[in-house]
């Protein structure tokens, strides 16, 4: 009779979360993850073909959680302001995890950038206030607000600033208005 599997995919993903949220992606190694579970690396490779597959599954799980839990909270009647407030709050409450995901350079950075871009466009395209704006203006709003959000989030994560929702709303609305008036913005990615 075969041995019963005691370490599941969920256990491994929980260990990955613990590692990345405390050490960042620099700690994303089979050995560190196995140590977190107090086991060998064998269960990891029984569940996942390789570390790239594990990273992709983990990032998919994280982005689903961000989409469904973090970015769905409403604070105002403006979807862009709400995205920013949620992003800054996430950074402030999960500073190491935020930096690991959105600041540090790692293999999933492009995937996370695409997630942020796609989520922004999903929100603005389904909002009456923004849906009729040109793609150029929406891109300008995204780029300007994204840069501002990353800066504010980095300040909040490092406890150098603690902006209130009202302050964030005021800054983002100013940035939206500037982007609408001056949409000629590019950012090489």
What residue ranges belong to the model's regions?
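Append "Primarily bacterial transcriptional regulators
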Residues: 28-35, 44
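Amphipathic alpha-helical linker/stalk segments
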Residues: 56-83, 120-126
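Alpha-helical DNA-contacting segments of helix-turn-helix folds
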Residues: 53-62, 70, 101, 105, ...
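Amphipathic alpha-helical packing segments from all-alpha helical-bundle domains
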Residues: 105-144, 170-180
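HTH DNA-binding helix-turn interface
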Residues: 21-25, 38, 45-55
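Amphipathic C-terminal alpha-helical segment
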Residues: 97-100, 146-164, 177-188
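Hydrophobic alpha-helical connector segments
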Residues: 70-96, 135, 145, 189
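Basic, helix-initiating cap at the start of DNA-binding domains
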Residues: 1-23, 32, 53-56
């Amino acid at each position: 009779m075969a041995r019963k599997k005691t370490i599941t995919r969920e256990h491994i993903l929980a260990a990955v979360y613990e590692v990345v949220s405390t050490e960042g992606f620099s700690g994303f190694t089979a050995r560190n993850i196995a140590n977190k579970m107090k086991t060998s690396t064998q269960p990891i490779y029984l569940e996942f073909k390789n570390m790239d597959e594990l990273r992709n599954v983990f990032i998919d799980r994280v982005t689903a959680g961000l989409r469904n839990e973090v970015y769905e909270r409403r604070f105002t009647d403006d979807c862009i302001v709400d995205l920013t407030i949620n992003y800054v709050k996430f950074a402030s409450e999960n500073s190491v995890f935020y930096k690991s995901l959105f600041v540090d350079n790692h293999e999933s950075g492009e995937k996370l950038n695409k997630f942020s871009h796609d989520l922004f466009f999903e929100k603005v395209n389904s909002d009456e206030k923004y849906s009729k704006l040109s793609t150029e203006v929406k891109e300008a709003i995204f780029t300007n607000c994204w840069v501002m959000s990353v800066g504010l989030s980095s300040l909040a994560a490092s406890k150098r600033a603690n902006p209130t929702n009202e302050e964030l709303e005021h800054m983002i609305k100013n940035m939206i208005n500037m982007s609408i008036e001056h949409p000629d913005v590019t950012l090489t990615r």
